[in-house]
Structure formats: structure tokens, C-alpha cells
Design a protein with these regions (language model features):
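Beta1/beta-strand and adjacent pyrophosphate-binding region of the FAD-binding site
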Residues: 2-16, 169-179
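Glycine-rich flavin
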Residues: 3-6, 22-29, 34-169, 202-206, ...
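Flexible, glycine-rich terminal cap/loop adjacent to redox cofactors
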Residues: 9-13, 19, 25-37, 49, ...
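Short hydrophobic core segments
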Residues: 9-11, 116, 131-141, 175-176, ...
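A Rossmann-like FAD-binding core segment of flavoenzymes
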Residues: 74-75, 110-113, 117-125, 193-294, ...
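FAD-binding beta-loop-beta segment adjacent to the flavin cofactor pocket
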Residues: 144, 288-302, 383-396, 400
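FAD-site-proximal beta/loop scaffold in flavoenzymes
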Residues: 153-170, 257-333
């Protein structure tokens, strides 16, 4: 076996690995990419793309059912799940060529498909072939973490890796885990016609989000028929005929049985480290993944980590992209630079969407005391939302005493598109006074940001006249 030598090897064909490989090749480096399964990663095959496609189907189903409010008679809306899932597959098929081995080989990347195993800190073995590089990037991502619930394996269950291949629409869907993945899929199936229960161990819904915004979203999900069991533990599962019975223990210790046609486990993620041979090179890991510093360097010179595999990192596709670009700078150029995580937005793609950047109101009060400002605008009062018949929501901006943006929170249709404005404000230290002076086109939902910012200006001049 004769080694093939590269400047850079990316292990993993998800976002971090793909950006590293394409970027490195574009800079003129000799690059290899190793992927043991399908290129495109979790986002394309089991996450962002299929879930958003299914949510689009579900939103359309809801719109059809409520079309009479707009003077449109549609009759009974029937969901054909096989056709809905075929739409999901078509969306994936349109995007997949961008991440394909053929495209990357065309970019000049050596693509090796198989399990990568570290031989030493500069060498990997893949299907009997040895690849050597000055720098290696671990970007193997994560997989669903399945809790040790007695009877679960025998009962059968879905994760985000299998739910998009479900054969029939469940009459009742039980979702264990009330985070973004579980909640998005819960709403999708509820709108498609399933009765949905969410079983969440934490006593508060979306505990990491702003409490006011999360409470508003929960109200809307409950109004759509989703049933929440908060502070509840899934104790054991069993099969009764074609149904799954889940025994759930509430916070007060009382146990109840929930029966469903399908069970979805959405309780978090675990790092994909098995089989890499990290012990051969003594890369430090923990339960969260590969330990790396702000410059994405592991404890072993020349070995980096990027994307969801990084322990303690924010597990978002856009963060994986930023990490990969930082690795390229640090691995291929003199000097080094850290990733700036001070203004990272994220979105939960329910309807309405929940978008967030920076500190919550509670976090801001803990750090800055009572001098903070909180400026709100109800989405339902915005002209465009009224015209669209959109759902209620809220724009909430948290500022320091000078009016600089510390955090922004939006519950609205298109919140994911709107949060960029508040992210820029945070990134560059803008004040809400400056935001209030930005001309926004009328009528748009984004006017709510300007109107929220104007609340501080009004409060400043209140009583002057």
C-alpha cells in the first residue's frame, strides 16, 4: 500500500467536510474527502432538507383546510402520504448533485468512499488505501441518540433517519423529545392529520429560548392539537398488536399510558467517532465529541475538528460552514484565527418560525442587570401580517443601556429571513435607534423590527412635549 499525499484531508461528507474540501481545492490545495455513506450529510438526507420539504407539505395542507376564510371553496383536503414523501425525495434529488462525488471530483478533490481509520496523525487508511496529509479535519457529524428505555428496541421506533420513509400516516404519533427536531416533525404530522403527543423531560418547553417567545409558540402548537407532556419521563415501551404503548411518568410521579401507531425518538445527538481509530493518535474526546479550541485545533498538531462533531459546539449547518472556513485559514495559511460565536442566529422552522440571536431577556438581566431595555412589537398588529391572515407572534429586541442590541427574538412567518437584520446589528454594535432609522419597504413583516426599535426612541422622548 503506497500512501497518497495531500495538503488536506476532510473526513466526513457533511457540510463541514464539503466546505473544507471545496474551499481547499478552490485555493489550489491538494485535497481528499472521505465519506463512509452518502455525501451531503445529515442535513441533506435526514435533517434540514427533508424536514423543511415535509413542513412545506404540511403547511399547504393547513392552508387548503382554511382556504374558506379567503373565499375559496376547496372541499375536503386529503393527504396522500406516499405522494407527500415522494415530494420530499424529489427535493433531495434536486439538491444532491451539488454534494455528489462527481461534482467534487470535478473540483479536483480525491473522493474516497469508505470508513477512515487513523494510522498515525498524518495518515488514514480507507478500504486498504493509505492517504497522508499535513492536515486532517475530522468532520464526521452526529447521529440520533436513543435513550435506554426498556422495551424500546423490541417495540420499534423511528428517528429522523427513518421517519421520512414511514409507510403510513399514523393516527397517533408519540414524540419523545420536545426540542427543535421533535417539535418541527410533531407539527408536520399534526397538520397532515395525526394526533400528536410530545413527551419532554424538561419542565419548560424550549428552555434555551426566550421564555416569552417559547410560551407563545407553545400556545399556537396546542391550538393545533399537539399535546405536551412536560417534565415527563418515558419509562418503558411495549407492543400491543399494531400499536405502541409508552408508559410515561409525570413530574408528580404518576404514571400514565400513551398509545400510538408510531413512535419518534428525538432526544438529542451523539458524536460519530466509532471506528475512526482516534485512540491510535490520542485525540482528546469526551461525551460531546472531539475536543477542539476556538481555532478548531485538537490536542494533536495538524488534526482539526469542524461541524457537529466538535464537543460543545453549536450544532447548526451554518455554524459548520463557518467552522470549515476557519479550518481552511488555520490549516493552509500562516497565523491562526478563532471562530467568532458572538452573533450566531438559529431558527426552529415551525409555523410560525422561531428565530433567535444573542441573549434572551433573562440572560441579559443576569449579565447586565436592570439597565437593559426590552422592546416589543406584536406581529399580529403589522399590516402585512393582517393582510396575509398570518399567525400571531412577536418581535422582541433586548438592548444594553445605550441601546445596543444584545439579543433578538422573533416568532413570525419568515422569522428565519428576518433575524439576519438583528444579527447584523449585534455583529457590528448597532443600536435600536439606528435600526429605527432604516427605511423598510411597506408592507412587509420585517417592518415589525423597525417598529420594535422605535419603541425605545419613543420612550426616550416621552414627556418632552
Amino acid at each position: 500500500m503506497h500512501p497518497t499525499t495531500f495538503d488536506l484531508i476532510a473526513v466526513g461528507g457533511g457540510t463541514a467536510g464539503l466546505v473544507t474540501a471545496a474551499g481547499g481545492a478552490g485555493l489550489g490545495a491538494k485535497v481528499a474527502l472521505v465519506e463512509r455513506h452518502r455525501m451531503g450529510g445529515e442535513c441533506l438526507w435526514n435533517g434540514c432538507v427533508p424536514s423543511k420539504a415535509l413542513l412545506a407539505v404540511a403547511k399547504t395542507a393547513k392552508m387548503v383546510r382554511h382556504a374558506r376564510a379567503f373565499g375559496i371553496e376547496t372541499g375536503n383536503a386529503r393527504v396522500h402520504l406516499n405522494e407527500a414523501l415522494a415530494h420530499v425525495k424529489r427535493v433531495q434529488a434536486r439538491i444532491a448533485p451539488h454534494d455528489s462525488p462527481e461534482r467534487f471530483r470535478g473540483l479536483g478533490v480525491h473522493v474516497a468512499q469508505g470508513q477512515a481509520v487513523f494510522v498515525d496523525r498524518h495518515t488514514l487508511e480507507v478500504n486498504g488505501e493509505r492517504l497522508t496529509a499535513r492536515n486532517i479535519v475530522i468532520a464526521t457529524g452526529t447521529s440520533p441518540a436513543v435513550p435506554p428505555i426498556p422495551g424500546l428496541a423490541e417495540t420499534g421506533f423511528h428517528t429522523n433517519e427513518t421517519i421520512f420513509d414511514i409507510a403510513e400516516l399514523p393516527t397517533t404519533l408519540l414524540v419523545v423529545g420536545g426540542g427543535p427536531i421533535g417539535t418541527e416533525l410533531a407539527q408536520a404530522f399534526a397538520r397532515l392529520g395525526s394526533t400528536v403527543h410530545i413527551i419532554e423531560a424538561l419542565p419548560v418547553f424550549f428552555a434555551r429560548e426566550d421564555a416569552e417567545i417559547a410560551a407563545l409558540l407553545r400556545e399556537q402548537l396546542e391550538a393545533e392539537g399537539i399535546r405536551f407532556h412536560l417534565g415527563a419521563q418515558a419509562m418503558r415501551a411495549r407492543r400491543e398488536g399494531s400499536s405502541t404503548v409508552l408508559v410515561v411518568r409525570a413530574a408528580d410521579g404518576q404514571e400514565t399510558e400513551l398509545t400510538g401507531d408510531a413512535l419518534l425518538i428525538a432526544t438529542g445527538r451523539r458524536p460519530n467517532m466509532d471506528g475512526l481509530g482516534l485512540e491510535h493518535v490520542r485525540v482528546v474526546t469526551d461525551r460531546g465529541g472531539v475536543v477542539a479550541d476556538a481555532r478548531l485545533r485538537t490536542n494533536i498538531p495538524g488534526i482539526y475538528a469542524a461541524g457537529d462533531i466538535v464537543s460543545g459546539g453549536l450544532k447548526f449547518t451554518h455554524v459548520a460552514d463557518v467552522m470549515a472556513r476557519a479550518v481552511l485559514r488555520n490549516a493552509l495559511f500562516p497565523g491562526s484565527s478563532a471562530v467568532d460565536y458572538s452573533a450566531v442566529p438559529w431558527v426552529t422552522y415551525t409555523d410560525p418560525e422561531l428565530a433567535r440571536v444573542g441573549l434572551t431577556e433573562h440572560e441579559a438581566r443576569e449579565r447586565h442587570g436592570s439597565s437593559i431595555g426590552v422592546w416589543r412589537r406584536e406581529i399580529g398588529a403589522v399590516d402585512r401580517v393582517i393582510a396575509d391572515g398570518g399567525p400571531p407572534g412577536l418581535v422582541k429586541i433586548v438592548t444594553d443601556r445605550r441601546g445596543r442590541v444584545l439579543g433578538g427574538h422573533i416568532l413570525s412567518a419568515h422569522a428565519g429571513d428576518m433575524i439576519g437584520e438583528l444579527t447584523i446589528a449585534m455583529k457590528f454594535g448597532l443600536t435600536v435607534g439606528q435600526l429605527s432609522g432604516v427605511i423598510h419597504p411597506y408592507p412587509t413583516t420585517a417592518e415589525a423590527i423597525k417598529q420594535a426599535a422605535e419603541q425605545r426612541v419613543k420612550s426616550t422622548f416621552a414627556g418632552w412635549m
